[in-house]
Amino acid sequence: MIEKERRPWGWFKVLHRGDTYCVKELYIEPDMRISYQFHRHRTEDWVVVKGDGIITQNDIETECKVGDTFFIGIEQRHRITGGKRGITIIEVQRGDCKEDDIVRLQDDYNRVDHFAWGHY
């Protein structure tokens, strides 16, 4: 059985992992959001499979719904916010898929990497 890893914004679970990729399911609760972040060593593809929300990429917000897809490039700033029903996405990471490859620029849960702003 695949276990959910709780986060302040909801949860995720790893569906499959290989040497250079990782497939996850993420659920972001209504009106919650992940940190505004980027990754130095991986890309991500997101597919909305349930609910709705807002995707932010490089400061541009886009409403999203079931069936919408998004590509997150290396060092591209991004965030997802759950809509009134929350949002579930499938995320395919490619590259170095370690959890510590997250540089947080803004975070509602006090997990910001203060040195990160010097990068931009």
Where are these regions (language model features)?
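A short glycine-rich, His/Asp/Glu-containing loop-to-beta-strand
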Residues: I2-F38, R42
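Double-stranded beta-helix
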Residues: I2-R7, R79-Y120
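Short beta-strand segments
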Residues: I34, I60-T62, D101-V103
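A generic "binding-loop/recognition-motif" signal
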Residues: M32, H41-R42, I60, Q76, ...
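Short acidic-glycine-tyrosine-enriched beta hairpin
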Residues: D59-R77
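Glycine- and acidic-residue-biased ligand/ion/polar-headgroup-sensing regions
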Residues: H41-I54, N58-D59
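Polar/charged side chains located within well-ordered beta-strands of beta-rich proteins
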Residues: K24, D45, T88-E91
